[in-house]
Regions:
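Beta-strand/loop-rich accessory regions of lumenal/periplasmic or secreted enzymes
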Residues: 1-146
C-alpha cells in the first residue's frame, strides 16, 4: 500500500473542495470563489471566505483632489465578486469541475502530492474587472497564492 502520510487527501464536496494533510485542513468554496476554511493544528484561522480589496487609506493629497469621489467604486468592489470560472488541477492535470454528480466518481480516499484551484472573479466596476486567483497547495500544507 502506498504511503499516504506524506500525501494530500482530496475531499470532493458538492460545492467545495477539501484538502487535508498532517496538521491542516483547507476548504475552498465554488460558490463563494475562494478559501472559506483554513484550519492548522486544530485552530480555525478564517471566519469567512477570503475577499479581494482594491482600496487604500486616503492621503491629504487624495482628499484635496477628490480622489475618494472618483474612485469610490473601488471601496466596495471586492465585497461581492461574481465567480465566472473555476478550474481544479490535481497534480498539474486539469479535471472536470467536481460538483454533483461528477464528484460521485471519486472516493473519499484520494491522495495526491499537490492540488491547485483557480477562480476567475468578475467585479462590478466600470469597465468590468476580472481577476484570476490561484491557490496551489502541496502535501506539507504550504499554500502559494497568485493573483
Amino acid at each position: 500500500m502506498e504511503n499516504t502520510a506524506t500525501k494530500l487527501r482530496v475531499i470532493y464536496g458538492d460545492c467545495t473542495l477539501g484538502l487535508k494533510g498532517k496538521g491542516f485542513h483547507y476548504i475552498f468554496s465554488y460558490t463563494r470563489g475562494g478559501m472559506e476554511s483554513l484550519n492548522k493544528n486544530g485552530k480555525e484561522w478564517l471566519y469567512r471566505e477570503t475577499l479581494s480589496t482594491f482600496w487604500r487609506a486616503l492621503t491629504d493629497n487624495d482628499r484635496g483632489n477628490g480622489f475618494e469621489y472618483r474612485s469610490s467604486v473601488w471601496l466596495g468592489a471586492g465585497k461581492y465578486p461574481k465567480v465566472k470560472q473555476i478550474q481544479v488541477k490535481i497534480e498539474d492535470t486539469a479535471i472536470e469541475l467536481p460538483i454533483a454528480p461528477v464528484n460521485n466518481q471519486y472516493s473519499n480516499t484520494e491522495y495526491v502530492s499537490s492540488a491547485e484551484i483557480l477562480f476567475t472573479l468578475e467585479y462590478n466596476t466600470v469597465p468590468k474587472t476580472e481577476v484570476v486567483v490561484s491557490y496551489r497547495i502541496n502535501a506539507l500544507g504550504e499554500i502559494k497564492v497568485n493573483v
